[in-house]
Amino acid sequence: MKIKAISIDIDGTITYPNRMIHEKALEAIRKAESLGIPVMLVTGNTVQFAEAASILIGTSGPVVAEDGGAISYRKKRIFLANMDEEWILWNEIRKRFPNARTSHTMPDRRAGLVIMRETIDVETVRKIIHELGLNLVAVDSGFAIHVKKPWINKGAGIEKACELLGIKPREVAHIGDGENDLDAFKVVGYRIAIAQAPDVLKENADYVTEKEYGEGGAEAIFHVLRVSGYMDF
C-alpha cells in the first residue's frame, strides 16, 4: 500500500538524547514534505508545544499531542477527553508521596496527567489507580509517566488526524521509540522503531533502525520514502 503520510514521535525520535532537534531528522522531514508527504508530529507533550514545533520544523500534517488526546490542524483544536479522574489520582499520589511532581506543562494540559518518572515509578502509579478503582491507564514514555483515559492513545489521535487529512490510518507510516508508540503501531500500515526503543516496540515493528535518536529518525523517514517508491534505493 502506498504511504500517504508519516507520523513521527518527537523526543528521542527526531532529537538528540538531550532533546535538541537533530539536523539530520530535520533534513529528512523536509525531504518528505517536499515530495508531497505530510508529516504529523505525535507527542506526549502539550498541543501548544506541538503546534510551535510543527511551525519551526516545517511539517504540514495535523499535530497529535498529549499522547493522542489533543489534535490540532489548521488552527482548530480537538480534545478527546477531560481530566476528572486524573486529578483524583494526583491528590492521592501527593498524600502518599509528597515529593512526587507533575510536569511543568500541566497547566496547559487538557487530556492527561504527566508525572515525572524520577519522583515515582509507573508500577506504583498503576497500583494506586487499581486501588482507587479509576478508569485510567499509566504508560512510561521513557521521559515521563503519562496517565490518561484508556481510549486516549497515539493510535486514537492518529485516526482522528487521518480523518482531517482525508486518508486511512493504514496509509500512514509511524515512527517512534517508546512504549506509548505501541497503540500507534496497531492502527497504521507501516511501523518503524528507533534503535534504542524497548524490545516490545521492536518486536512489533516492520523495520528497526540501525541508528539511534535523531539519526535513527532520519534513517526511518528515508526508509519509508524508498519502500513507498518516492525515492530510489
UniProtKB/Swiss-Prot annotation:
Keywords: Carbohydrate metabolism, Hydrolase, Magnesium, Metal-binding
Reaction equation(s) it catalyzes: 2-phosphoglycolate + H2O = glycolate + phosphate
GO terms for MF: magnesium ion binding; phosphoglycolate phosphatase activity
Pfam family, one: Hydrolase_3
Entry's Gene Ontology cellular component terms: cytosol
InterPro entries: HAD-like_sf (IPR036412), HAD_sf (IPR023214), PGPase (IPR006382)
Active site per the UniProt annotation: 9 (nucleophile)
Positions that bind Mg(2+): 9, 11, 177, 181
UniProt EC number: 3.1.3.18
UniProt-annotated binding residues for substrate: 154
Cofactor or coenzyme needed: Mg(2+)
Biological role stated in the UniProt entry: Catalyzes the dephosphorylation of 2-phosphoglycolate.
HAMAP family cross-referenced by the UniProt entry: GPH_hydrolase_arch
Family assignment from sequence similarity: Belongs to the archaeal SPP-like hydrolase family.
Protein name: Phosphoglycolate phosphatase
